[in-house]
Amino acid sequence: MPKHATSLPLSLPAPPSGTPLYRWFYNELRTAILDGRIAPGARLPATRDLAHEYKLARATVVASFEQLKSEGYVEGKVGAGTFVTQVLPDDLLQVGRSSAGKSVGHRRVQWSSYARRLRLYPGVGPRTTRAFRANQAALDVFPTTLWAQVVARRLRRASAQLLSGGEALGYRPLRQAVAAYLNTSRGVKCSSEQVLIISGVQEALERAAHLLLDPGDPVWMEDPGYPGADIVFRAVGATVHPVPVDDEGLDLEWGRHHWTNATLLYVTPAHQFPLGVTMSLRRRLALLEWARRSRTLIFEDDYDSEYRYQGRPIPALQGLDRAGVVIYAGTFNEVLFPALRLAYLVVPPGMVDRFAAAQAVSMRHAPLLDQAALCDFITEGHFARHIRRMRELYSERLAVFLEASRSRLGGLLEIPEVEAGLQTVGWLAPGINAQHAAVEAAKHEVEVIPLSRYSARRVARQGLLLGFAAVDARELRRGAEQLARALETCPTR
């Protein structure tokens, strides 16, 4: 592979081990756009030409272009080609441009090591909801009128104290309601004094990483696993060690055999992301005992725990913890709506003061009126009723998804049994490349994600992540038909 291209001003290092080629090539293109080597409005070479020049599969280059398009860095013009957008989405990464057009951008800024690590990763933005978008609730049926009434009533009754500010830990009545809810629904053992109200699990991860990790500290993560956690840990300089997942969850024995003990372990035991495995009780107890003996802290992301369609739920790791090694996080954003930006973090008693201090320094507290409205929504019973209704709706949509997939995608995509959550993994027929499949699916207005995007190691089997909760039955059936057409166009090796 040439180090210096002739058609684009790129200097390409060897791709990092475990990084998908399309992601590596996308990062190099994005960096060149951001630092001005590829100017706004510039026309990019054809994907076929770039693939030939850099000795890449054309599907790899196409996938890189699709990622850049989805994030607003480039745009396609029919009959003309692909061009860099005039206004880039990363305004914060560019200090600005002078009136004469000379760049005074971020190349002159002495970024910290944290910032340099952080900017390796792409941003995220709003996307159109369509089949089979993962990680999104059914926003089309959220009770907006009821929510508006609760918010309006709370605003009318707002006291001067509520309007002036509050505790860094969060609105005390909401913390009490969250503690009671978690004790009843998830077996979490905590007082309201251990609960922090935050904006989301991503913030919880960043808070924990800054407080608990020094550069070089080892962190274990499920593989495949949640990339948002990987981003946070690497940004603070931690060394991330991927640990494979088997039928019982994170493979503890594999991790002990291949890695030294960890400072922190991140895990999604209720519904492993993205494979959907529920960690067995036996594995949970073994994990807790190992953490106690090795003095490792566990960050439990109770992802998708609210929606289970088969079997009895297993209590959260935190509820089984007798040694105070578990930090527990969950969110209302996926249960209610993403723009709510309210979640919760439960920390061992000895950690409360440090976490509260960090909260006060960084954001003081989450919006108090929103916290108070959510508290009313919970204590008046609306939240519990909403979860019951949504569990029934998602079960119905899951049935439609499975029926449509099996009738139209048989021989192309194998859908395993789904026990919980809002999405599942579909295993592609032998010879079909997941990245190529995702590109073809996008052309057919279907959103699927290659499983390799979540894995640091080479995946043993090609798979796609598919959501079934965000759209109605008609769109699910349309999606199955369109995905089948897309997969039928994919070459097999």
Segment roles from a protein language model:
Residues 1-153, 350, 356, 360-367, ...:
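N-terminal basic, amphipathic alpha-helical segments
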Residues 151-295, 306-307, 312-323, 394, ...:
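Conserved core of the PLP fold type I
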Residues 344, 372-380:
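Helix-loop "lid/cap" segments that line or gate small-molecule binding pockets
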